[in-house]
A protein has these predicted regions:
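Conserved phosphate-coupling serine/threonine residues in phosphotransfer and NTP-handling enzymes
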Residues: 12, 110-112
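Acidic di-acidic motifs
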Residues: 16, 163-164
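Short hydrophobic faces within alpha-helices
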Residues: 11, 100, 171-172
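Short, acidic loop-to-helix structural element flanking the phosphoryl-transfer center
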Residues: 80-108, 118, 144
Length: 174
């Protein structure tokens, strides 16, 4: 019997793509030698990736140092923007979390940057439903390893992972 629910964030609880694209456009405007325009489809294809893998996918023609510089700058700006403005929660997310939290312990594990889950909480006031969180931006580990950290740290048994990608599906089995 499942007693614990681990959630992915992007694509599962909210869709932040529009706000993220807005922020990235602003940041990239400071780099006149970079003519890349980040589209919603680009962002969608990067959801669930760690920051280094997303950088390689978005900016394959740039050296790794510049990729990471851009990723860090954009991610930092994202956290500020999304914390202040929020983004689109999926339908009935809060009602669902409220109902589930009465019976199950809820957690978020994401491949996002440090601060991203907190900006989600800040904007939407949903932290009250979650027991703990973890992300690759804090640990430097992939989602499967962060699932293990959450499970061990909270002495959990019988978790289920709710996500929207194949990577989410396999991350609990690692």
């Amino acid at each position: 019997m499942y007693q614990i629910v681990l959630f992915d964030l992007d694509g599962t609880l909210w869709n932040s793509i529009e706000g993220v694209c807005t922020v990235w456009k602003t940041v990239l405007a400071n780099y006149p030698n970079i003519d890349k325009v980040i589209t919603p489809n680009d962002m969608k294809n990067c959801m669930g990736l760690t920051i280094d893998k997303a950088g390689k996918k978005l900016f394959p023609n740039l050296n790794e140092t510049l990729q990471m510089q851009l990723m860090r700058e954009c991610c930092k700006a994202e956290v500020v923007y999304l914390g202040n403005h929020g983004e689109k929660l999926y339908p009935k997310v809060e009602d669902t979390l409220k109902c589930l939290s009465k019976k199950y312990k809820l957690f978020i594990v994401s491949n996002c940057q440090d601060g991203y889950i907190h900006c989600f909480f800040k904007a939407h006031k949903l932290d009250k439903y979650f027991t703990d969180i973890e992300c690759s931006g804090v640990t430097g580990l992939p989602k499967g390893e962060n699932n293990k950290l959450i499970i061990e740290r909270n002495n959990l048994q019988h978790p289920v992972y709710v996500g929207d990608t194949t990577g989410d599906r396999i991350s609990l089995s690692l």
